[in-house]
Amino acid sequence: MRILVTNDDGIHSPGLHALAAAVVAAGHEAVVAAPSSDWSGASACLGPLEDPKRVSVERVALPVPDGSTMTGFSVGAPPALISMLADLGGFGEPPEMVVAGINRGPNTGRSTLFSGTIGAVLTGERFGWSGMAVSLDVAVSDGSDDGSDEGPDDGGPAREDPREPHWGTAADLVRTVLPWLVAAPQRTILNLNVPDAPLSDVRGLRSAGLAPVGGVRTVITGIDDHGLDLDLIANDRPVPEGTDSALLVAGWATITPLLPTSAVDVELPLAEWSAFLPGGGA
């Protein structure tokens, strides 16, 4: 299957490279197209663009965990627009599925609304694709990671930096889940969150609902006459047991099926509101 691989952290993210390698290892064709800059927190936005009538696209060589390289597209656009451009044939034959990530930071709880990673996947659903957003629970408490979003324990090459996130753990779970998603009905959307730990330390994979809050939150650290200073910190607010945020903190990988934007059935006082219209709603 031809699968779009994208993210919101940008084309040079090692999480993106690990995800692309996992898709190829699972026997699929990876079309790697990701933003040329960081679009974390972009949700499903389509801009702004420097030029509304032109998007920059550059072919780049991307490193993958086995030491080889693959070709990708560095795109001057947010991830949701990249999904749209892929469907329009901007990167060759349109794909049949999209996987986005591996995000540097969790995407849990109702805060998933703001995720560019998930925005790319939900946009793909509009074109009839199934998709999966993948995020690694990289610590953000020191303010060094965006959080919007291989070591010997998981069979990959030795990690040169002990602080390097365990991208291989998330990649292994992608290879496990992907065959099911390929066989699932069209427009099936999954949100996968993985602990930042060796695969052997992950307690298991659990289906989970969305927590009221996500794993990280924005705080204002300063106010002056010219603006606000912001930071992103780990969310220490209590969350209900069994939700994605709670299970992830407890060492479980979590997977949550998501619905795209849809209408709900609510009884509205239409007759009362229509009375103010010239025709009275007739």
Task: Identify the function of each model-found stretch.
Residues 106-115:
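Glycine/threonine-rich flexible loop motifs
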Residues 3-6, 13, 17-87, 93-94:
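A cross-family phosphate/adenosyl-ligand binding-site feature
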Residues 2, 29, 128-130, 188:
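Proline-centered loop/turn at the N-terminus of a beta-strand
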Residues 144-282:
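Electrostatically charged, flexible surface regions
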Residues 9, 38, 78-79, 103-106, ...:
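Short glycine-rich anion-binding loops that position phosphate/pyrophosphate groups of nucleotides
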Residues 35-38, 103, 136-139:
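Short, ordered loop/turn segments at secondary-structure junctions
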